[in-house]
Amino acid sequence: MASKHNADLSSAAMLAALLLCALGAPVEYEPTDSPAGDFSGEEQEVTPDLLSASPVWDLIIGVTAHHQKEFEDEFQQEVKYRFLNHYKLSSLPADCPSANFSKEACLQRLAEGLHTYMVLFKHVEKEYPSSSILLHARYHSGALIGLIKEKMRNPGQVTVPTSRQEQQLLQDMDNPSTFHRKMTAHNILRQLHNFLRNGKVAIRKREMPKQKRRKDDGIIPPIHPSYQMT
């Protein structure tokens, strides 16, 4: 993958680390060398008691939003981004249903889904070992898992893939075709972006008072014009 956005992604990582320290949030996964770099920008108003208000969401969604640009830079219009629709994975985590699903159940699904993505990241790393998007997505995903579990009544109910399940997941994605493996890796990052955006909407709806929910259907405003996925 192209590395031209490394500086921006490193800035996002440093901002995440500072904000997490300020909020006292645990980091579920912490790499030996965490992403770092200088940062600048306006401060955001944070409401620590609401999971959906955590700045970690916008940081990781902002990072994964760079994926389409990197995909297009790599393939130079020879392969359209929508072509990834042909590389569907049955192992991709499901979103929280819009109705008849409690907040606790939604939190559990999100945490377990992110644990699954942690395994899928190993396939991405195999194909793109120097991917800065992967580096920051993995780091922020670990932080988000910790925040989600803090909000759960029974965080011990969250299941993590066993070694055997992890091996099976990675084996299912293996393919003799280099192109096929790369498309699978790209689709993982693409679907992670969607999973996170949908997850934030789902949690925001469940945290929002019913009166406010009627006025605001839980739509997240764009993080930044340059982060739009088309």
Swiss-Prot record:
Family: Belongs to the IL-6 superfamily.
Carbohydrate attachment residues: 100
Role according to the record: Cytokine with a wide variety of biological functions in immunity, tissue regeneration, and metabolism. Binds to IL6R, then the complex associates to the signaling subunit IL6ST/gp130 to trigger the intracellular IL6-signaling pathway. The interaction with the membrane-bound IL6R and IL6ST stimulates 'classic signaling', whereas the binding of IL6 and soluble IL6R to IL6ST stimulates 'trans-signaling'. Alternatively, 'cluster signaling' occurs when membrane-bound IL6:IL6R complexes on transmitter cells activate IL6ST receptors on neighboring receiver cells.
Gene3D superfamilies associated with the record: 1.20.1250.10
Disulfide bonds: 96-106
Induction: By LPS.
Pfam families: IL6
Assembly behavior: Component of a hexamer of two molecules each of IL6, IL6R and IL6ST; first binds to IL6R to associate with the signaling subunit IL6ST.
Keyword Signal (UniProt): yes
Keywords assigned: Acute phase, Cytokine, Disulfide bond, Glycoprotein, Growth factor, Secreted, Signal
Signal sequence residues: 1-24
Organ and tissue specificity: Expressed in kidney and spleen. Low expression in liver and gills.
Compositionally biased tracts (Basic and acidic residues): 206-218
Listed GO MF terms: cytokine activity; growth factor activity; interleukin-6 receptor binding
Localization terms from the record: Secreted
Region annotation Disordered: where it falls in the sequence: 206-230
Name used for this protein in its record: Interleukin-6
PANTHER family in alphabetical order: INTERLEUKIN-6 (PTHR48494:SF1)
InterPro entries for this protein: 4_helix_cytokine-like_core, IL-6-like, IL-6/GCSF/MGF
GO biological process: acute-phase response; cell differentiation; glucose homeostasis; hepatocyte proliferation; immune response; interleukin-6-mediated signaling pathway; liver regeneration; positive regulation of receptor signaling pathway via STAT
GO cellular component: extracellular space
